[in-house]
Swiss-Prot record:
This is E3 ubiquitin-protein ligase RNF138. GO terms for cellular component: nucleus; site of double-strand break. It comes from Xenopus laevis (African clawed frog). It comes from the Eukaryota. A zinc finger (RING-type) spans 17-57. Gene3D superfamilies: Zinc/RING finger domain, C3HC4 (zinc finger) (3.30.40.10). A zinc finger (C2H2-type) spans 134-157, 164-192. It is found in: Chromosome. E3 ubiquitin-protein ligase involved in DNA damage response by promoting DNA resection and homologous recombination. Recruited to sites of double-strand breaks following DNA damage and specifically promotes double-strand break repair via homologous recombination. Together with nlk.2, involved in the ubiquitination and degradation of TCF/LEF. Also exhibits auto-ubiquitination activity in combination with ube2k. May act as a negative regulator in the Wnt/beta-catenin-mediated signaling pathway. Zn(2+) binds at C85, C88, H100, C104.
Length: 222
């Protein structure tokens, strides 16, 4: 395998996604035209553009539109090769480059990004608080909010089927901190695509939530 690269300019042609024009993340390959994209970019293109390759408009069959084939050769190279962030110059494995952007201050300054607080609605009151932070159940990555946790797990661990405790469920009042789920990544995607805090007060238990819902429905019916 080639030795570690010194800067991102040497790898842009092979490891850049044609859609987002950034380093590939969870690379997938079309089966007919063999073009490679970030999995997320490809799935978004399928939802908006139909059954065509986002680059050449070649045909994409039904099965790969919902379950694209991972470009394991590209993924392996990215796990072996290193490069420098084009914004801050920090060296790392290419596989982790796009994840690095989430914490790269210069990248966030370039695109005008900044951390946001979440507003929690509790009856007629609303308060500002910091989003809860989670640790990835499959690796040492930590200090992730819910959205970042899902993105990290889908980008780094999507094809791993591991029985683990869900880190989000474990923090909820009605959750069981020792109950495991057979495929924690599939569970996260099925149960945690939205943030409970945006719809309810997570500091009260499930029975109290039910009573509030009944009371509110009674007010509406009157």
């Amino acid at each position: 395998m080639a030795e570690a690269m010194s800067c991102s300019s040497e790898i842009t042609e092979e490891f850049l996604c044609p859609v987002c024009q950034e380093i590939l993340q969870t690379p997938v390959r079309t089966q007919t035209c063999r073009h490679v994209f970030c999995r997320k970019c490809f799935m978004l293109a399928m939802k908006s553009g139909g059954a065509y390759c986002p680059l050449c408009r070649g045909p994409v069959n039904k099965s790969e539109r919902s379950a694209p084939v991972r470009a394991t050769d590209i993924d392996l190279e990215m796990r072996m090769l290193s490069g420098g962030c084009m914004y801050c110059g920090k060296m790392m494995k290419l596989h982790y480059m796009k994840l690095h952007y989430k914490s790269c201050r210069k990248y966030q300054e370039e695109y005008g990004l900044s951390p946001k607080n979440v507003t929690i609605q509790t009856g007629q009151n609303s308060t500002k608080c910091q989003e809860p932070k989670y640790k990835c159940p499959l690796c040492s990555e930590h200090n992730l909010n819910q959205r970042s946790l899902l993105e990290h797990c889908n980008n780094v661990h999507y094809y791993e089927e591991v029985e683990m405790v869900c880190p989000i469920c474990a923090t909820l009042p009605w959750g069981d901190p020792i109950q495991t789920t057979g495929n924690v990544i599939a569970h996260l995607n099925a149960r945690h695509q939205f943030n409970y805090q945006e719809f309810m007060n997570i500091n009260i238990d499930e029975e109290a939530q039910f009573q509030i819902a009944v009371a509110n429905s009674y007010k509406i019916s009157r």
